[in-house]
Regions:
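Serine-esterase "nucleophile elbow" of acetyl-processing enzymes
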Residues: 22-72, 84-93
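Gly/Ser/Thr-rich helix-start
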Residues: 35, 41, 73-76, 102, ...
């Protein structure tokens, strides 16, 4: 009798175990391709410890069944990623995200036209480079979900570890091109390929007026430091050799340096990604 009872308990335990395994979510692999905004997820010390965690860490906290690989390359353009695509060791994955374009804009790289994408004309343009990247990802896994992420808006950037590394924001054009055009190109590619687009430029709520609370600069007339909100700081000189860092901790809003997301900004990006990755 006791032996029969033990057997029933054993069978019940097996059934419960199989049910539990059945309800466990399948592990999903995700390769995140990008520039410094992606790279910093594993290098938060390079933010002057102003960021605690990037968007991939935040996504996997909400979706623990996802395992990510960081293919963020600091300072790289879409054109460089495309040119080096065979040397990056990109693995086969269930999901790929491509978050590029802001460095192409600042570097004056030609956006090109949709024809460059459609006709696969090569890596001389951003449009053509996206075709190269997407083709590579499809060769690795033609069933993978590919997510395109547009560049986010930016204001005046000053690198916290080297003030001479600075750039104006997307409130004006660079070499006759607007960052908004690069975002629109990515939307166009997404629509053509029927890919999911996370449109940070237009739909994240991260706009020129909330990327930083102010920029601290010397008043040109008095020489006294003053906190200038956007757009009042546009055109006021910044001397990287003599001026203090223009974005003290109190200036942090959606970014901590005018370009790279703060914890608040990374949370916005992660939440937008969770909505599409969680489907």
């Amino acid at each position: 009798m006791a032996q029969s009872s033990n057997m029933k308990k054993y069978i019940l335990l097996l059934v419960v175990s199989f049910c539990f395994l059945g309800f466990q979510q399948k592990q999903t692999t995700w390769v995140a391709i990008g520039d410094s905004i992606t790279y910093l997820n594993e290098h938060t010390n390079e933010t002057g410890n102003r960021v605690s965690k990037g968007y991939m860490t935040r996504v996997t906290e909400q979706l623990p069944n996802i395992q990510y690989t960081n293919q963020g390359h600091n300072g790289w353009t879409a054109i460089r990623i495309a040119t080096e695509i065979e040397n990056l060791g990109i693995a086969k994955a269930d999901v790929y995200s491509i978050f590029l374009g802001t460095n192409d804009w600042w570097g004056g790289k030609p956006l090109g036209s949709f024809n460059d994408y459609e006709k696969n004309t090569g890596n001389q343009t951003v449009y053509g480079s996206f075709r190269t990247i997407i083709n590579k990802l499809r060769s690795l896994n033609d069933q993978a979900k590919i997510i395109l992420i547009t560049p986010m808006q930016r204001v005046d950037f000053v690198y916290i570890n080297s003030y001479k590394n600075n750039a104006f924001g997307s409130y004006k054009d660079k070499n006759g091109q607007w960052l908004a055009q690069f975002a629109e190109a990515i939307n166009t590619i997404g629509k053509f390929e029927k890919l999911t687009v996370v449109d940070l430029y237009n739909k994240s709520g991260m706009n020129h007026d909330n990327l930083v609370k102010f920029k601290r600069l010397k008043n040109p007339h008095t020489g006294v430091y003053q906190n200038y909100p956007y757009p009042d700081f546009i055109g006021i000189p910044f001397n990287p050799d003599t001026d203090e860092y223009p974005y003290p901790v109190e200036a942090i809003d959606m970014t901590y340096d005018g370009l790279h997301p703060s914890d608040k900004g990374y949370a916005v990006i992660a939440d937008m990604l969770v909505k599409v990755l969680g489907k």
